[in-house]
């Protein structure tokens, strides 16, 4: 079964399990939006692998007049996002592969959360370059994602600590989350920073890290 099918199956329960599976939930998503450096109150935003729209919801708290395009390959996840943003005419949805989809417009901000780690290293490099080119001057790229520690012992220890901090969740939901992790292809912080440099970003930083979770921020 593909990763898309796995997320489609879990769409209705996805949000309710996030805080249990991500002990740093509020800081992780909150810092990803707080670090964005864009002064206008109506940015044009693209959310890659948007899922049910959690990160976009955080963004709307900072930029309530933002025009946001949510893109995801999992149709059922986007249906949940449509419910979340019902009545907001500034929100639109695209069900497609963000590696191959062609845009005829540029954006002020490109965001993503817990999606890009499903790509191979080469795909990550391609994606970052692709969307760097779609950013306006002064545009921001933010990726809140899972990362890989190059030391296997450290990586295993970090995962163990995360398991210790997992909140209340059913055994079935926990086992399903473990199965979804088998599709993960996280890359190191250093590799992804190098990808951002090669894509031409002038400013790059890691404003947040918690065990395997990290926020990448870059600005043209």
Predicted segments with their positions:
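Conserved class I S-adenosyl-L-methionine
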Residues: 1-39
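Class I SAM-dependent methyltransferase SAM/SAH-binding core
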Residues: 46-48, 52-100
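Residues lining the SAM
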Residues: 112-116, 144
